């Protein structure tokens, strides 16, 4: 069962993916063994999918776009599989609200708009709503 300690562990990891189990134990005043056991449980239950970084693409001469996608319901499953197969799509989310999916697209500055346009070529994608990231605030 997911509890307060699990939430605190996840919050610490979210803020600093490099934090050690020792540091987590110290900050939460729990044993290292408890931290290790909780992390194993959170991974086994699929709550923690992986550990990753948040890159500042602009500092590397790259561009990042957050793209809202309007996808026809009858094509949704295949369209999202096709979109997820692109190596320049870093993340893809099924969402509710104004869009049916959100894609995080990363490419060099010269081709980012072409990559966004390529999403419109996927069968079932009716429209794209790109927002180009200027800077990471948090």
Tell what function each PLM region has.
Residues 1-138:
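A compositional/biophysical signature of low hydrophobicity enriched in polar/charged and small residues
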């Amino acid at each position: 069962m997911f509890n307060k300690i699990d939430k605190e562990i996840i919050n610490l990891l979210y803020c600093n993916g490099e934090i050690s189990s020792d540091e987590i134990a110290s900050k939460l005043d729990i044993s290292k063994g408890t931290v290790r056991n909780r992390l194993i449980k959170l991974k086994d239950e699929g709550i923690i999918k992986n550990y990753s970084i948040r890159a500042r693409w602009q500092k590397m001469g790259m561009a990042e776009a957050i793209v809202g996608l309007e996808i026809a319901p009858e094509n949704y499953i295949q369209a999202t599989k096709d979109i997820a197969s692109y190596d320049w799509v870093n993340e893809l989310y099924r969402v509710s609200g104004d869009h049916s999916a959100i894609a995080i697209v990363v490419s060099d500055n010269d081709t980012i708009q072409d990559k966004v346009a390529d999403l419109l070529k996927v069968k079932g994608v009716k429209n794209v709503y790109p927002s180009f990231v200027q800077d990471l605030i948090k």
